[in-house]
Design a protein with these regions (language model features):
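N-terminal hydrophobic/helix-forming segments and targeting peptides
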Residues: 1-384
Length: 384
């Protein structure tokens, strides 16, 4: 790790710097200068979820409840009737940070029985996120500070925590499924899968004439506008300091960025067998057929003809297939850190992603081969 506070006068060839939920790591060739360009593999660390509010203790008709806030665009119904653990950061009064992961089931959002909602299967399920997504975590009446005391014990802290950033998550582990073992089911595939691929690729990269970088931003699911998000200064600051550590200034940074390129990796929508009409007929990614290059003429994705060709060459060098994703004209598409990175730094960027089903569900689905396909393609991009 490279500490962020001291001057970066003797920067290691390989290093990383972390800021809260974001990480930037790099590998350098044996010989570099202040104008050596960068090749970046970007992803985001966050996923849609339920986050515990600062004062969560609540009770209703004999049940202990936790007040939670919806983070990002969750699929509401997928959080019902799941055994939920709690994980995140806990901050002490002295500023010390503890990481907490309670992997055993602690809470559950119970669905209303069909006997009490006779029209649910014909009229559809409607959930009020304030009223109907509140989990229970015990029986009886909650007392003020009860959750705080529980966190103190779970995190093995000597005093009550001053603050926390805690998420609920499905405790069911990842599983390879299908009679042919061709599918991978897990929570948070969007976008932990791409984070794994980027870091795996960086660890294996052997750059020759550029600096290989993995940038894992936070807060993409809520717009990226934070000091650790893609719209914030974190990446620009790190790249600027790498250039400065090699004796460069504003001019050298501009030259380094002008020769740089970025692959923004964030999962794509695989064609859904039950809803094929929701997909563009000529651009329907399938699982286990390689990463999809994402294209949007309205710049919701940063892909251009040049950058698409760069990623295609990386796939060919790695021996992995690739495909193309385009949204329907009558169905707006999402966006990624790609356009934000391209806008902030002027770096030529391509958006790609592993095809998956059930995006933003508490439990998602992709092909077992595609994580490896993406890691191999990113490895070739960071090395070639």
């Amino acid at each position: 790790p490279v500490p962020p506070d001291p001057a970066w006068t003797e920067l290691p060839d390989d290093g990383y710097v972390r800021r809260d939920g974001a990480v930037i790591a790099w590998r350098s060739p044996s010989s570099t200068s202040a104008t050596t360009p960068f090749r970046l593999a970007g992803a985001h660390t966050d996923s849609p979820c339920l986050r515990v509010k600062p004062s969560p203790d609540g009770s209703a008709v004999g049940w202990k409840q936790l007040a939670v806030e919806v983070y990002g665009g969750i699929l509401n119904n997928t959080w019902l009737d799941r055994d939920l653990g709690i994980a995140g950061r806990v901050v002490g009064a002295d500023g010390a940070v503890a990481l907490l992961n309670v992997a055993e089931p602690v809470a559950r959002v119970p669905q209303l029985a069909v006997h009490l909602d006779r029209d649910v299967n014909s009229g559809g399920l409607t959930l009020d996120t304030q009223q109907h997504l509140t989990p229970v975590w015990g029986v009886g009446a909650s007392t003020p500070g009860e959750f705080t005391s529980w966190v103190r014990g779970a995190a093995e802290m000597s005093s009550d925590p001053a603050w926390w950033e805690l998420c609920l998550y499905d405790t069911q582990g990842a599983a390879v499924i299908g009679a042919d073992h061709s599918l991978l089911a897990s929570g948070r595939l969007d976008n932990q899968l791409s984070c794994w691929a980027a870091t795996t690729a960086l660890a294996a990269a052997e750059p020759v004439d550029h600096i290989a970088v993995a940038v894992l931003n936070d807060h993409e699911e809520v717009g990226s506008s934070s000091n650790t998000g893609a719209a914030g200064p974190f990446l620009e600051a790190v790249l600027s300091r790498i250039v400065a550590a090699r004796g460069g200034g504003v001019e050298e940074l501009a030259r380094a960025l002008a020769g740089s390129s970025c692959v923004s990796a964030d999962n794509a929508h695989a064609v859904h067998p039950n809803y094929p009409e929701r997909h563009e007929p000529g651009h329907r990614p399938i699982v286990n057929a390689g990463p999809a290059i994402k294209v949007n003429s309205n710049q919701r994705y940063a892909t251009s003809g040049d950058t698409a060709a760069v990623f295609q060459r990386a796939c060919e060098a790695a021996g992995v297939p690739w495909q193309v994703f385009v949204s329907r004209n009558n169905m707006p598409c999402g966006s990624t850190i790609g356009p934000i990175t391209a806008t902030r730094l002027g770096i030529a960027t391509v958006d790609v992603g592993v095809p998956q089903l059930s995006m933003h569900s508490a439990r998602e689905l992709c092909g077992v081969d595609d994580p490896g396909h993406l890691a191999a393609a990113l490895g070739a991009f960071l090395t070639e």
